[in-house]
Amino acid sequence: MIKDCKIKPPFFEIGPKSYLFGDDVLDLALAADAAAEKYDVDIIFTTPVIDIRRVKEATRRIHVFAPHMDALRPGRGLAEILPESLVAAGAEGVMLNHCEKQLSMSALRASILRADEVGLATIVCADSIAEAEAVAKLSPNIIVAEPTELIGTGKASDEDYVRASIDAVKNCNPDILVLQGAGIKCYNDVYRNIYAGAEATGSSSGIVALPTREARNAMVDEMIRAVRDAWDARQKG
């Protein structure tokens, strides 16, 4: 866990994965940047590695994260992702252990330590409450509590899971932020998660699988508005 992580609740994560590439990635990043400014919500934009510098230089308000890295040090390691190269490109953090890029616990520990060493914030995925508790002991900055079976389905976690996973992480380390992901596809999904107690939520296919740039950008605005609306309603009690 880096101590100067600038991300504060409420926040949202957007990951293009490999649905988008080239100018479409940049266009989505610009839409996210505008929504972050409009609603005063931090957004993690988990950027394809090759686009990190381009996205970072074109935006002001979003937090640019890499989708993966390896725990190696400068030297040999063909086609691996060097932590120092992510920092040099402008990344502020890195996502680890996504279900599409899973790590063993020993590899995850090594990767978090390397990220801490070079100053990258860490957002680590956990697909169950038990795994969230185990990951919390490694002290990442953020844990994504998303059941793998719900990813990309359009079905979000229920409120009991949201609350139980938050409690599991906070009981282990109250400084870790908790993002509730998987199956987020609309305003209501976002609102429900945030209002139920989540500090953040996020979406990939719910945004990037939409067929046009206009639809994707409109969905970004809708979801970030939901974050702000739910958070403000929660604060009012």
Task: List the model feature ranges, each with a label.
Residues 67-71, 75-77, 104-106, 124-129, ...:
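Glycine-rich beta-to-alpha transition loops that act as phosphate-gripper elements at the mouths
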Residues 17, 48, 86, 146, ...:
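Conserved, mostly hydrophobic/aromatic
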Residues 92-103, 142-155, 196-219:
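Glycine-rich phosphate-binding active-site loops on the catalytic face of alpha/beta enzymes
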Residues 111-117, 157-160, 205-237:
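C-terminal helical cap(s) of enzyme catalytic domains, especially alpha/beta-barrels
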Residues 1-81, 122, 132-139:
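Conserved N-terminal beta1-alpha1 strand-loop-helix module at the mouth
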Residues 60-115:
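Glycine/small-residue-rich loop that forms an oxyanion/phosphate-binding "nest" at active or ligand-binding sites
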Residues 72-73, 79, 140-165, 176, ...:
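Glycine/Thr-rich beta-alpha phosphate-binding loop at enzyme active sites
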Residues 126-139, 183-201:
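Catalytic cores of alpha/beta
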